[in-house]
Amino acid sequence: MRVKIKCWNGVATWLWVANDENCGICRMAFNGCCPDCKVPGDDCPLVWGQCSHCFHMHCILKWLNAQQVQQHCPMCRQEWKFKE
């Protein structure tokens, strides 16, 4: 018996790999997008700090710009440094 494939339609999904399911700043799901973006994906990436907390890039940048003196992680209050 031989089987011949006449048509194949591949389907894929993507998912960010993060410790939490939601951004600690905007509370939106990581597999969605932040309030500033319209579409999830590469235009709304996740960023990690050296403290291992993860946020939407736009959310943490707004948070850091609002800090007056030192920039701290909104979750653990350690000095914020982007993970390399």
Curated annotation (Swiss-Prot):
Gene3D superfamilies: Zinc/RING finger domain, C3HC4 (zinc finger)
Residues reported to bind Zn(2+) 2: C51, H53, C73, C76
Post-translational modification: Auto-ubiquitinated.
Pathway: Protein modification; protein ubiquitination
Keywords: Cell cycle, Cell division, Cytoplasm, Metal-binding, Mitosis, Nucleus, Ubl conjugation, Ubl conjugation pathway, Zinc, Zinc-finger
Residue sites binding Zn(2+) 3 per the record: C34, C37, C44, H58
Main subcellular localisation: cytoplasm
A cellular component annotation (GO) from this entry: anaphase-promoting complex
Swiss-Prot/TrEMBL GO biological process terms: anaphase-promoting complex-dependent catabolic process; cell division; positive regulation of mitotic metaphase/anaphase transition; protein branched polyubiquitination; protein K11-linked ubiquitination; protein K48-linked ubiquitination; protein ubiquitination; ubiquitin-dependent protein catabolic process
MF terms (GO), sorted A to Z: cullin family protein binding; ubiquitin protein ligase activity; zinc ion binding
Metal-binding keyword on record: yes
Superkingdom, taxonomy of origin: Eukaryota
Domain remark text: The RING-type zinc finger domain coordinates an additional third zinc ion.
Family statement: Belongs to the RING-box family.
Free-text function comment from the UniProt entry: Together with the cullin protein ANAPC2, constitutes the catalytic component of the anaphase promoting complex/cyclosome (APC/C), a cell cycle-regulated E3 ubiquitin ligase that controls progression through mitosis and the G1 phase of the cell cycle. The APC/C complex acts by mediating ubiquitination and subsequent degradation of target proteins: it mainly mediates the formation of 'Lys-11'-linked polyubiquitin chains and, to a lower extent, the formation of 'Lys-48'- and 'Lys-63'-linked polyubiquitin chains.
Protein name: Anaphase-promoting complex subunit 11
Species this chain originates from: Bos taurus
